[in-house]
């Protein structure tokens, strides 16, 4: 009897051990998922752009030098251009920048363009009279033309707006400096009896510049972007050209006196509207 009870206890213990082991086998461990690495957004980038500058109107003024003998020799009057325009043309640019996050980036850019300049002014009444023309009629004018090379060095900042698929719209602004260099200015006096043709040395100068930008970039790859945008560039005014050889002479047909020196004309600056396309490569 006692022996039978002992065997029964052993069997119950064995069954309990097997049941506990089976229950342990049924416990399923929860999988641990490591977070996926996020793409690095911060880093340097390079950019290159080509664009087209639309024709723009500006203004300017020039001094009329009286060649008569002393005490009448000198600047007789100052005239505003009736028309002063910068023709359209291509522009080219390169830059290096840094992206801080998915919204903010900055860059330094260097751009270049070259454009024709045209100016027109009516002749003063006393010049018309000297040609035997009616001084109150529109019968005499000056035509000026030259070319200008413009380099801009700008520091820019951009805010990238929320993405729409592969497209990222953006807004930007920049400040910097513009180097403006004029070629020789050619002036023609236009009227039935006019013969004046003169060349004047173009001036060069550094000027303040500012820009506003808007556009959209398209992801060609994770690192290469196609950039389509618009830029408004304001370049401050400065010296345009000096006096011609006759005005600079100390001795002329009217006698002897001081010759003209320094700038004869100044422009009012340029408001340049540009559409641009470029590539931006981001290092990550």
From Swiss-Prot:
Signal sequence interval, chain numbering? 1-23
Keyword Signal on this protein?
Answer: yes
- What InterPro entries does the record tag this protein with? OMP/PagP_b-brl (IPR011250), OMP_b-brl (IPR027385)
Out of the domains of life, which is the source?
A: Bacteria
Protein keywords: Signal
> What family does the database annotate?
Belongs to the surface antigen msp4 family.
Protein name as catalogued: Uncharacterized protein BMEII0376
Name its species. Answer: Brucella melitensis biotype 1 (strain ATCC 23456 / CCUG 17765 / NCTC 10094 / 16M)
